[in-house]
């Protein structure tokens, strides 16, 4: 099992958000995380990416405790937008990729090889402030996958996408899964979950 999160619990104030939750994904597997608003989906994904510490439980990556070095092998698409409006698309993508530890030349080559696959030809010089919500989603997906992570975590990836954007994203997720990437995604879209994933976890 590539990722094993076991007995995860988390409380914020008086609210118990997660209570003894288990989540796992292996290479080439897609796991859908289901649940209503407030069920703890985003909190669990943020715990798996070490953005939030659990109150209890363990997270193993490839058989050992998940550490900072392992996070370079993880791609994360957050539900909230974390983009700088005054940057251009290419500049912004390079900045975010370099935060993952890639050199400028390596990062730019990776980004430029991925952009045509996401329908982003000609986007390099676009101001980020001109991007629609769906275009912002494509940009953040680009940054989450361009470094070829072994584990891809997607929080509501279809949010803000039109039909064409959703179809493109579905095709890319299927391709990544076929190439051996482990994928965990949260979604309200049961049709997408059943089409893409072979396992579901209900919160």
Protein language model regions, located:
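Helix-to-loop junction immediately C-terminal to a conserved catalytic motif
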Residues: 49
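Catalytic Walker B motif of ABC-type/P-loop ATPase nucleotide-binding domains
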Residues: 152-155
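Conserved ABC ATPase "signature" region
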Residues: 94, 98, 106-123
